[in-house]
């Protein structure tokens, strides 16, 4: 168990405090309120690594095997549709997410330096942002297919590559602003340092801007994009008459639902944590304990999105369903 920072006055203004026992008779007259401030520290709560590490290993193996299988299925035929190309990129991004899981596993047994903390943060947020951008791209492609007649040409394939490079660069740019403010900090009572946002070295406005920009650009605006374009698609499909419209609607709803189910809770608590770090929400031990416990857990659950997309493909692939059911019948 690791101890967090106190909710009252800080005992030491330096980011790496010493742990010598205070002498109550030297240079200072300790009263009851000072003693209360020393002993009433908010103790951070975290899951035991005996629980977290096995879950991460299982998730890592599942994502690797599942996405390798899905990647081979998608590459069996020539890639002619942009939706297939996006699914391939999702598989590759899931392998990048596996690197995030490896960092999380190692973090439970090793002490990261500030440079490694920044690298870990970049890897994690590039995975998150690129995953969100791919879902938005898939949404836009579906909207184009429903509302317009889009031809598959060589020029379009060049555009796919250009869009992919642009989205990767944008994901790196957005992740860098988060990583630049992360440091390896050893707080009062901690056995070893951990990767944290060091708000003491930054202004309140900068802390707030980082918290808001990451959540707005990474979640709220893409979510608004999904709601508008998928809403237009659903309205168009609902009025149309063709056999496969139910399958298309089911696919769209599954992709959006899976993303909201996996990343939605993490972004909500991350936004609250940003407001707390910036001082816009009054600190309390119960709130800090809840955020300290739930954010790593929800981050782990969010990374499960890379494995759940395999199930989305299975549920939406009628050919695979027929083969699966025929195997059960035998």
From Swiss-Prot:
Name assigned to this protein: G-protein coupled receptor 74
Entry-linked InterPro entries: CCR1-9-like, GPCR_Rhodpsn, GPCR_Rhodpsn_7TM
Membrane spanning residue stretches: 50-70, 85-105, 121-141, 160-180, 210-230, 252-272, 295-315
GO molecular function, one term: G protein-coupled receptor activity
Disulfide bridge map: 117-195
Keywords of this entry: Disulfide bond, G-protein coupled receptor, Host membrane, Membrane, Receptor, Transducer, Transmembrane, Transmembrane helix
Pfam families: 7tm_1
Primary localization: host cell
PROSITE patterns: G_PROTEIN_RECEP_F1_2
Membrane topology: Multi-pass membrane protein
Subcellular location: Host membrane
GO cellular component: host cell membrane; membrane
Similarity comment: Belongs to the G-protein coupled receptor 1 family.
UniProt cross-references to CDD domains, sorted A to Z: 7tm_classA_rhodopsin-like (cd00637)
Record flagged with keyword Transmembrane: yes
């Amino acid at each position: 168990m690791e101890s967090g920072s106190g909710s009252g006055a800080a005992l030491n203004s330096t980011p790496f405090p010493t742990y010598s026992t205070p002498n109550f008779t030297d240079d200072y007259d300790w009263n009851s309120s000072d003693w209360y401030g020393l002993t009433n520290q908010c103790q951070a709560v975290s899951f035991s690594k005996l629980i977290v590490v096995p879950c991460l290993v299982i998730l890592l193996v599942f994502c690797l095997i599942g996405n390798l299988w899905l990647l081979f299925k998608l590459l069996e035929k020539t890639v002619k549709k942009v939706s297939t190309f996006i699914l391939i990129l999702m598989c590759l991004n899931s392998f990048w997410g596996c690197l995030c899981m490896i960092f999380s596993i190692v973090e439970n047994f090793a002490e990261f330096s500030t440079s490694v903390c920044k690298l870990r943060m970049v890897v994690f947020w590039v995975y998150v942002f690129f995953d969100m951008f791919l879902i938005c791209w898939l949404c836009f492609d579906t909207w184009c297919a429903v509302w317009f007649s889009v031809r598959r040409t060589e020029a379009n394939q060049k555009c796919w590559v250009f869009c992919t490079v642009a989205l990767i660069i944008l994901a790196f740019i957005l992740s860098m602003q988060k990583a630049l403010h992360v440091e390896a900090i050893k707080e009062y009572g901690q056995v070893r340092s951990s990767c944290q946002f060091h708000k003491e070295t930054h202004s309140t406005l900068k802390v707030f801007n980082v918290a808001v920009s990451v959540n707005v650009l990474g979640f709220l605006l893409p979510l608004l994009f999904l709601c508008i374009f998928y809403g237009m698609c659903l309205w168009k499909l609902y009025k149309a008459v063709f056999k496969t419209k139910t399958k298309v609607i089911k696919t769209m709803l599954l992709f959006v639902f899976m993303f909201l189910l996996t990343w939605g809770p993490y972004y909500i608590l991350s936004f609250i944590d940003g407001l707390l770090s910036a001082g816009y929400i009054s600190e309390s031990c119960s709130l800090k304990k809840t955020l300290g416990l739930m954010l790593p857990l929800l981050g782990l659950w969010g990374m499960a999105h890379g494995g759940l997309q395999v199930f989305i493909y299975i549920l939406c692939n009628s050919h695979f369903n027929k083969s699966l059911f025929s195997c059960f019948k035998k």
